[in-house]
Swiss-Prot record:
Residues 46-284 are annotated as: Loop-1. Keywords: Cholesterol metabolism, Cytoplasmic vesicle, Endoplasmic reticulum, Glycoprotein, Golgi apparatus, Isopeptide bond, Lipid metabolism, Lipid-binding, Membrane, Methylation, Phosphoprotein, Repeat, Steroid metabolism, Sterol metabolism, Transmembrane, Transmembrane helix, Ubl conjugation, WD repeat. A motif (ER export signal) lies at residues 447-452. GO terms for biological process: cholesterol metabolic process; COPII-coated vesicle cargo loading; regulation of cholesterol biosynthetic process; SREBP signaling pathway. The modification Phosphoserine is found at residues 821, 837, 850, 905, 935. SUPFAM superfamilies: Multidrug efflux transporter AcrB transmembrane domain, WD40 repeat-like. Belongs to the WD repeat SCAP family. There is a cross-link at residues 454, 466 (Glycyl lysine isopeptide (Lys-Gly) (interchain with G-Cter in ubiquitin)). Residues 40-279, 334-344, 423, 540-707 are lumenal. This is Sterol regulatory element-binding protein cleavage-activating protein. Residues 731-1278 are annotated as: Interaction with SREBF2.
Length: 1278
């Protein structure tokens, strides 16, 4: 078994177990899934509802003025401004973005020093902003003149009264945590606790207090003991009521003068106006809502044609809920992970989820409803999932592989889409496997099995067809037969055999081809390729950033490039566009600002272990406010009872501020308790929470090499994934016989439909079989070795037939019946039995109904039965209590052959009474044999000359129901010319099949023989008490092949060893297993040197045939074992009364698979190289896949014909019916031909079918056997 096959088998088994679990516990699983959906959708409260998201409009900063209150736009003219952009905004928001770091980093600094000193500078900045005054010709303006004045907070916000400003300008900064008091800040021993003490314990959906005061998302602030970059970011938020360009420009120039950012490239060119809606926009919801309505309607109208679905509305609603929940879970999880998707109808993501979810729903529905309806609900769900497991996982792996490759392209747009796709695929898979599968099991469970008439053929379950000229598919032409003898239920092609509606054809086409998902995957690959080809800078930018960040030199050690004058202007006439203020003088290199103290030399040399973190400014810093919650600004204004519904605010360009702090300031600002904290300074060798920089050129080279190794590893991983993906596509798209000549799909189309569009149906023929008559009662045991056929009826008569010609070779009557050894007498007895059996039918048989039997001329007719016997009624005595007790014999005496008088018999001698009655009646006395005691030893040789039977008695040809002390025959086996018989008395007999003589026998024991195995020279007898006896058969002369009459048939095996009448046969007891089972043994098989027993104690045991050593005890059934199969390949199959079938590995004793097969006992079981065929008391024949344990199809038999099956070859199955046999193609489940066995056999069902080696079939019709040869058309087909 290859790796792919093993993986496929593991996946199939896992899905099968999952299906059983979902169908067994539906309510808990649905509740658990509902809780998971609610938990994953809870973060959606952070997002706006569809259509309620903020709307933006951008205008240039230069020459900006608030729009008028009324729009002067004329109707019909194009207008670039939105309708809501009228009048002044509620407020103008100015953010001062601060990035601060301690540089250079001292090795003795603590983790808290990363953010304590940078946060302390926020108080200084707030003072500078409040003290800023603009003096011009129009007068003096301060912050109080232009800012938004607020009053009291809402009454319910008492906890925030000391944190948010009241009765003054709305100005927010991290200093608000300490009431803008620097002394409070320095006295605070735990800054982290102070910041997070107002955070909610649960997941907060609106803007938190930390986000409001810091102005940036929490993960970008850097205020954490676990940060890896020693960089702190926060904003000081100013809210203005009026727009004053000069005041804002002077404030920007002053801050950039005091805290310059030399490498800043932020553009201050535009204002962003953000409008907030109040109600849901119905117009934007229409496309998405329409899509889901169409999905609901399509699934409903499609499932109306599926009879196996109880509630069409419920299933359609469950599909819509599954798809919608998958979408909401995906967006909720993405929000929880930090992504902020939108649910606007214009996004493509919701529609992709709809397409993928719909296709998965159709796949699961089609797979489950295609399972056999006679199975339990949980088995149908398990088989449906198992059959589609490989396809589901294969598509899932392919999609994840494409997403993984797309993510490693490092293009931001592709990476964002890949993150969404991964979350969407996982959530959709989760809901399909748990929610929809469980709902589908509940719906199918509601379909009561009583509502489905299993006896009706499939065409009876269809709605009445419209009158058309041509008959519909699977509608058979009228025949002379009243009804079909079977009903077949195919799993893979059950719906293909019917004329499907077009809507179901579309569903099954989408489910079979998975067209939508493959198109999406192909489109994703093309889109990723186009983006990578057109924007390859994503990878280069990433690599350059990695090398720059880990460079030991940085930008400070690089020599300044000579730049011509005029290329990079140092200032701009407009202060808003100037990098440096007009009055700022250029500082010499490595010189601090005038107000900044010089760095002490003692700390500047040899005390830092990492370079200064590079403070960089990128385009993403211009709009960092976009990463805040959409409820950030509405929440802030709502605290002061100001609503933003149907109004807008204007965000001014960000003012960048860079703060570089030296280690002395960090040490001076440290709290006394920080030194005793549990956070020691990082060591140079540690790579845990901190980024340790290189210490020398060697370390720098190692870091640079490590970056290259990372890139190489990513490339290697992408290459491996791509190769595996191509290999999987090759395995999927190319068949196994790819490239082989003549390996086309034409053979599979042969016989796919039992009745095609042209009205072709499998042929029905009638032949005259060879009828084997000779039994008065029903035949109980059948055995054959290919050339000979042995049958035994309930009366105890054994007949030996020639399997080629159908002639009766020998009859072995019941031991209590007198027997004539002459041939003529045997023929007369045959004719008497024939006359008796024919007379029992109520009338003479019509000529031509059955072929005449070949026989010799018979003698004079015998007298009537019991005519020569006297009336023994007077000898009957019912007073048993008055009878004297006979003493038991002290020792058993040897048994002699029939026909010899027993000497010193211990039983009562009735001969005197019988002789007296004969004399009174005037009849001649007869010889009455006495009972034979059992023989004493395990070895039982009998010479041929001792085989004298009863004396000839032609006047009494048949005593069918004479009493016998030997017991009835319970088991029968045939090999060569020897017949082994096991009787209810526990006696084992070996008979000559040709001569009809008893060759040897064993002693009688108290337990009868329930099963026999006759293999080579070994005989194994299983007894009613659970014991096993191993016998060895020996002859005094060499065994010679038996010369059979007639040419050997096709496929016949070499003749089994036989012995002539002159050989002495001895049967030795070699081994005995006294307690093989606790209860009676019901099944016994042997092959490949192994003996397998099955018992009513629910277990199987595997013995070694040569020494009777028990190898394994197999437990897996919950009922008694009824049938066992084993072949030369060590494959063992067992069936029990629990209706289950187990496949075992005889080499290891492990159970390979367990299948719930029938509603009742499993009556027969056989295997081919690829299939397992079982039958049960429910008159159902099931065909299973041998490797996966999946049910392929089932055949409903006539009442009483459930066990009548046989395998002619690996591709041909024969089943019995009411007077007929049917031939099936095992590969496709197609009915090839039905053969009726004449008029006489129509009234009785075929109870048993035995396939001979010469392509002949023996059918058991009660007291008669029919020998049928396989039709020639099937021989050519096979």
């Amino acid at each position: 078994m290859t790796l792919t096959e093993r993986l496929r088998e593991k996946i199939s088994q896992a899905f099968y177990n999952h299906g059983l679990f979902c169908a067994s516990y539906p309510i808990p699983i649905i509740l658990f899934t509902g809780l998971c959906i609610l938990a994953c959708c809870y973060p959606l409260l952070k997002l706006p509802l569809p259509g309620t998201g903020p709307v933006e409009f951008t205008t240039p900063v230069k020459d900006y003025s608030p729009p008028p209150l009324t729009s002067d736009h004329k109707p019909g003219e194009p207008n670039e401004q939105p309708e809501w952009y009228v009048g002044a905004p509620v407020a103008y928001i100015q953010q001062i973005f601060v990035k601060s770091s301690v540089s250079p980093w001292h090795k003795n600094l603590l983790a808290v020093d990363v953010f304590r000193s940078p946060l302390s500078r926020a108080f200084q900045l707030v003072e500078e902003i409040r003290n800023h005054v603009l003096k011009d010709s129009s007068g003096t303006r301060s912050l109080e003149d232009v800012c938004l004045q607020v009053t009291d907070l809402l009454p319910g916000l008492r906890k925030l009264r000391n944190l948010l400003p009241e009765h003054g300008c709305l100005l927010l900064s991290p200093g608000n945590f300490w009431q803008n008091d620097r002394e409070r800040f320095h006295a605070d021993p735990d800054i982290i606790r102070t910041i997070h003490q107002h955070e909610p314990k649960t997941l907060q959906t609106s803007a938190t207090l930390k986000d409001l005061l810091f102005g940036v998302p929490g993960k970008y602030s850097g205020v954490s003991l676990y940060t890896r970059k020693r960089l702190v970011s926060y904003t000081i938020t100013l809210v203005f009521q009026h727009y004053h360009a000069k005041f804002l420009g002077s404030l920007r120039a002053r801050l950039m003068l005091l805290h310059p950012s030399p490498n800043c490239s932020l553009r201050a060119e535009s204002l962003v106006h953000v409008h907030f809606k109040e109600e849901i926009g119905i117009a934007e919801l229409i496309p998405l809502v329409t899509t889901y309505i169409i999905l609901f309607a399509y699934i409903y109208f499609s499932t109306r044609k599926i009879d196996m679905v109880k509630s069409k509305w419920g299933l359609a609603l469950a599909a819509v809920v599954t798809v919608l929940s998958s979408l909401l879970m995906s967006v909720g999880l993405c929000t929880l992970f930090g992504l902020t998707p939108t649910l606007n109808g214009g996004e493509i993501f919701p529609y992709l989820v709809v397409v993928i979810g719909l296709e998965n729903v159709l796949v699961l529905t089609k797979s489950v409803v295609s399972t056999p309806v006679d199975l339990e609900v949980k088995l149908r769900i398990a088989q449906g999932l198992s059959s589609e497991s490989w396809s589901i996982m294969k598509n899932m792996a392919t999609e994840l592989g494409i997403v993984l490759i797309g993510y490693f392209t490092l293009v931001p747009a592709i990476q964002e889409f890949c993150l969404f796709a991964v979350v969407g695929l996982v959530s959709d898979f989760f809901l399909q496997m748990l929610f929809f599968t469980t709902v589908l099991s509940i719906d199918i469970r509601r379909m009561e099995l009583a509502d489905l008439n299993k006896r009706l053929p499939p065409e009876a379950c269809l709605p009445p067809a419209k009158p058309v000229g041509r008959p519909t598919r699977f509608e058979r032409q009228p025949t002379v037969r009243p009804s079909m003898p079977h009903t077949i239920t195919l799993q893979p092609s059950s719906f293909r055999n019917l004329r499907l509606p077009k809507r179901l054809r579309v569903i099954y086409f989408l489910a079979r081809t998975r067209l939508a998902q493959r198109l999406i995957m192909a489109g994703t690959v093309v889109w990723i390729g186009i983006l990578v080809y057109t924007d390859p800078a994503g990878l280069r930018t990433y690599l350059a950033a990695q090398v720059t960040e880990q460079s030991p030199l940085g930008e400070g050690a690089l020599a300044p490039l000579p730049v011509p004058s005029g290329v990079l202007p140092a200032s701009h006439p407009d202060p808003a566009f100037s990098i440096f203020p007009p009055d700022a003088s250029k500082l010499p290199e490595n010189q601090t600002l005038p107000g900044e103290p010089p760095e002490p030399g003692g700390l500047a040399e040899g005390v830092h272990d990492s370079p200064a973190p590079e403070v960089t400014w990128g385009p993403e810093d211009e709009e960092l406010w976009r990463k805040l919650s959409f409820r950030h600004w509405p929440t802030l204004f709502s605290y002061y009872n100001i609503t933003l519904a149907k109004r807008y605010v204007s965000l001014l360009p960000v003012i960048p501020v860079t703060l570089r702090l030296n280690p002395r300031e960090a040490l001076e600002g440290r709290h006394p308790q920080d030194g005793r904290s549990a956070w020691p300074p990082p060591r140079p060798g540690q790579g845990g929470l901190w980024e340790a920089g290189p210490k020398g050129p060697g370390t720098a080279q190692a870091q640079r090499d490590l970056t290259l190794y990372k890139v190489a590893a990513l490339g290697l991983a992408s290459g491996i994934v791509l190769v595996l993906l191509l290999l999987c596509l090759y395995r999927v798209l190319c068949p196994r016989n790819y490239g082989q000549p003549g390996a086309g799909p034409g053979r599979r189309r042969r016989g796919e439909l039992p009745c095609d569009d042209y009205g072709y149906a499998p042929p029905e023929t009638e032949i005259v079989p060879l009828v084997l008559r000779g039994h008065l009662m029903d035949i109980e045991c059948l055995a054959s070795d290919g050339m000979l056929l042995v049958s035994c009826c309930l009366a105890g008569h054994v007949c030996v037939w020639d399997a080629q010609t159908g002639d009766c070779l020998t009859r072995i009557p019941h031991p209590g019946q007198r027997r004539d050894s002459g041939v003529g007498s045997g023929l007369e007895t045959q004719e008497t039995w024939e006359r008796l059996s024919d007379g029992g039918k109520g009338g003479p048989e019509e000529p031509g109904d059955s072929p005449p039997l070949r026989h010799r001329p018979r003698g004079p007719p015998p007298p009537a039965l019991f005519g020569d016997q006297p009336d023994l009624t007077c000898l009957i005595d019912t007073n048993f209590s008055a009878r004297p007790q006979l003493p038991e014999p002290a020792q058993p005496e040897p048994r002699y052959r029939a026909g010899r008088r027993a000497q010193d018999s211990a039983g009562y001698d009735f001969s005197r009474l019988v002789q007296r009655v004969y004399q009174e009646g005037g009849m001649a006395p007869v010889h009455t044999p006495a009972l034979r005691p059992p023989s004493p030893g395990p070895t039982f040789p009998l010479a041929p000359e001792d085989e004298a039977g009863f004396p000839p008695e032609k006047s009494c040809p048949s005593l069918a129901w004479a009493p016998s002390t030997d017991g009835s025959i319970w088991s029968l086996e045939l090999q060569g010319s020897l017949i082994v018989v096991g009787r209810s008395s526990g006696r084992l007999e070996v008979w000559d099949a040709i001569e009809g003589t008893l060759r040897c026998s064993s002693e009688e024991v108290s337990s009868g023989i329930t099963a026999l195995v006759f293999l080579d020279r070994r005989i194994v007898a299983a007894r009613l008490n659970g014991s096993l006896d191993f016998f060895s058969l020996e002859t005094h002369t060499a065994l010679s092949p038996l010369q059979f009459r007639g040419a050997p048939g096709r496929g016949s095996s070499p003749a089994s060893p036989a012995c002539s009448s002159s050989d002495r046969v001895a049967c030795h007891l070699t081994h005995t297993v006294p307690c093989a089972h606790q209860k009676p043994i019901t099944a016994l098989k042997a092959a490949a040197g192994r003996l397998v027993t099955g018992s009513q104690d629910h277990t199987l045991r595997v013995f070694r045939l040569e020494d009777s050593c028990c190898l394994f005890t197999l437990q897996g059934h919950s009922g008694a074992i009824t049938t066992v199969y084993i072949d030369q390949t060590m494959v063992l199959a067992s069936g029990g009364q629990d209706g289950a079938i187990c496949l075992w590995d005889v080499l290891t004793g492990s159970r390979v698979s367990h299948m719930f097969a029938h509603r009742g006992d499993v009556t027969s079981l056989t295997c081919t190289t690829s299939c397992v065929i079982s039958s049960g008391l429910d008159d159902l024949i099931s065909i299973w896949d041998r490797s996966t344990g999946i049910k392929l199809y089932s055949i409903q038999q006539d009442l009483g014909c459930g066990a009548s099956l046989g395998v002619i070859s690996d591709n041909l199955l024969v089943t019995g019916g009411q007077g007929c046999v049917s031939f099936w193609d095992l590969n496709y489940g197609d009915l090839l031909q039905t053969v009726y066995l004449g008029k006489n056999s129509e009234a009785q069902p075929a109870r048993q079918i035995l396939v001979l080696d010469n392509a002949a079939i023996v059918c058991n019709f009660g007291s008669e056997l029919s020998l049928v040869y396989v039709p020639s058309v099937l021989e050519k087909l096979d």
